[in-house]
Structures are given as structure tokens and as C-alpha cells.
């Protein structure tokens, strides 16, 4: 993935992969335990995302779930991609619980990335069935359930501050 946003150039020494994060997560969990029906989830990226997702979710005193970027920036949906992602989360007691996302505000819509235009309607349905069949929770990006494709929005219509500041290098969050 091409580095174009200011975030991509930051040294993330205090907000990613920091040794104090698991302890901080335990403090968050302690607060959430005071309320009913709370679900906590982490978005985890970086060089050691798999280990960190497990560390952030293992046991009963950390987050309920985590998701990474296995699918978000993949150019193609392949059986090996799905198998590799599932292999990271074997069904083992105390290991943690995954969540899965194929799309979000920082990645192009999966239907546009993974499928030719002529097959998008059927592919969007298949993609939702696949997402629902993965062991874990589903995280849907607004419009994903409808099979929405990535939209090019003219600069004049942009609302997203990051897209405006980095035009035309970055994908806007408006579409």
C-alpha cells in the first residue's frame, strides 16, 4: 500500500505496539464491567497485529474482540487469504474472539476491489455469505450490506477533512 497520508509517516511509538496497552485495556474493561451488555472491540494494525489482537482479547479482563487488516487492503479475495485469516484464530479456550471486516472508511469497498463490474451483484451476495460464515463477529461498513461500490467524488463535493488535505493522493471517506 502506498504511503500518502500523514498517519502513514508517523512514528507510532506511543499509540501502537506499546507495552502499556494491555494494562490500559484491562482498566477499560474494568470500567465497562460496571454496565450491562457492553461489547468492546479493537482495530489492530501494525507489524505484529496477530499477536497483539490475541493479547488484547485473551482472558476475561481484556477486550471482547479485535479485528485486523487481513481483508481490508487485499487486492483479491482468495481461498488462501481466507484460510490464513482463519488460522490466526483457532478455537482455543481463552485465546480471544475475532471480528472480521472486509471494508471500512480507510479502504476501498471490497466489491470494487475484488470483482469485475459485470459480476458485482452476485459477488456482493457471496461476500456477505462468506463474512457471515467466518467464526467471529461481523463488522459492516455502512452500505456494505447493500453491495455498494466505491464512488469517485469530485473535489468540490468532498466533506472529509483528510481527503481534502491530501487530495488527490488518498481515498476519501465520503464515498
Task: Indicate residue ranges for each PLM-predicted region.
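Active-site and adjacent substrate-binding regions of carbohydrate-active enzymes
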Residues: 1-175
Amino acid at each position: 500500500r502506498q504511503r500518502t497520508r500523514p498517519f502513514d509517516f508517523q512514528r507510532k511509538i506511543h499509540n501502537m505496539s506499546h507495552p502499556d496497552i494491555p494494562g490500559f485495556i484491562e482498566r477499560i474493561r474494568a470500567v465497562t464491567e460496571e454496565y450491562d451488555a457492553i461489547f468492546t472491540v479493537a482495530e489492530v494494525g501494525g507489524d505484529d497485529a496477530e499477536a497483539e489482537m490475541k493479547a488484547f482479547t485473551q482472558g476475561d479482563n481484556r477486550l471482547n474482540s479485535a479485528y485486523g487488516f487481513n481483508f481490508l487492503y487485499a487486492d483479491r479475495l482468495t481461498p488462501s487469504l481466507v484460510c490464513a485469516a482463519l488460522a490466526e484464530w483457532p478455537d482455543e479456550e481463552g485465546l480471544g474472539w475475532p471480528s472480521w471486516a472486509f471494508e471500512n472508511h480507510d479502504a476501498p469497498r471490497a466489491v470494487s476491489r475484488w470483482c469485475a463490474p459485470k459480476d458485482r451483484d452476485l459477488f456482493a451476495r457471496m461476500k456477505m455469505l462468506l463474512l457471515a460464515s467466518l467464526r467471529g463477529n461481523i463488522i459492516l461498513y455502512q452500505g456494505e450490506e447493500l453491495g455498494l461500490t466505491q464512488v469517485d467524488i469530485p473535489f468540490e463535493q468532498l466533506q472529509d477533512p483528510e481527503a481534502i488535505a491530501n487530495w488527490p493522493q488518498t481515498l476519501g471517506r465520503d464515498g
